[in-house]
Amino acid sequence: MIKLIVGLGNPGAEYTATRHNAGFWLIDQLAREAGTTLRDERRFHGFYAKARLHGEEVHLLEPQTYMNRSGQSVVALAQFFKILPDQILVAHDELDLPPGTVKLKLGGGSGGHNGLKDITAHLSSQQYWRLRIGIGHPRDLIPESARAGAKPDVANFVLKPPRREEQDVIDASIERALAVMPMVVKGELDRATMQLHRN
């Protein structure tokens, strides 16, 4: 059963619309659905709300530590409420999936994502759930003929807003993720994964 849903992103208005904040977009939607408001909670180093989602009590968190220190926020809340790693779902932007794709998985490496890297270090475990929200990779924007020697600027890419057509399909993928949340919060994660990956 998932007791904590974390969305990753960077704090501040200048980052709100950037690809790296896709995790925040999901949490904002969940809070709206639950009719709750995230509030600044200093002991958890983030914006936090306790929500009732589909009959289950769930903690929602948006770390305000900047991406590469997200673990500090996650572990503070997890320890306070005695939440185990496999009861945590982390929603994050995923370079290795095209915009419009969203996938659930338990465990695994960080794939170069600094937020995941820091969470893994703070939890001393990789065994937490991830909701991977595809944002695409900057190499996909380079014509194939020019890709051979090109070095795409990933840091710049994730800190820019998606193009309009990308934003539309990312929003649609978040809607699909929201549709499986009743299963997620009830602990039916295999079923949720199958449904999400079918689409």
Swiss-Prot record:
Subcellular compartments: Cytoplasm
Highest taxon of source: Bacteria
Protein name: Peptidyl-tRNA hydrolase
CDD domains: PTH (cd00462)
Catalytic residues as annotated in Swiss-Prot or TrEMBL: 20
Primary role: Hydrolyzes ribosome-free peptidyl-tRNAs (with 1 or more amino acids incorporated), which drop off the ribosome during protein synthesis, or as a result of ribosome stalling.
GO BP annotation list: protein quality control for misfolded or incompletely synthesized proteins; rescue of stalled ribosome
Residue(s) at site: Stabilizes the basic form of H active site to accept a proton: 93
Gene designation: pth
Lineage of source species: Bacteria, Pseudomonadati, Pseudomonadota, Betaproteobacteria, Burkholderiales
Nucleotide-binding as UniProt keyword: no
Enzyme class: hydrolase
Pfam families in the cross-refs: Pept_tRNA_hydro
UniProt keyword terms in alphabetical order: Cytoplasm, Hydrolase, RNA-binding, tRNA-binding
Enzyme Commission number: 3.1.1.29
GO MF, one annotated term: tRNA binding
Family: Belongs to the PTH family.
Positions with a binding annotation for tRNA: 15, 66, 68, 114
A single GO cellular-component term on record: cytoplasm
Catalytic activity line of the entry: an N-acyl-L-alpha-aminoacyl-tRNA + H2O = an N-acyl-L-amino acid + a tRNA + H(+)
Residues marked Discriminates between blocked and unblocked aminoacyl-tRNA (site): 10
Organism: Burkholderia orbicola (strain MC0-3)
Subunit structure of this chain's protein: Monomer.
Main location: cytoplasm
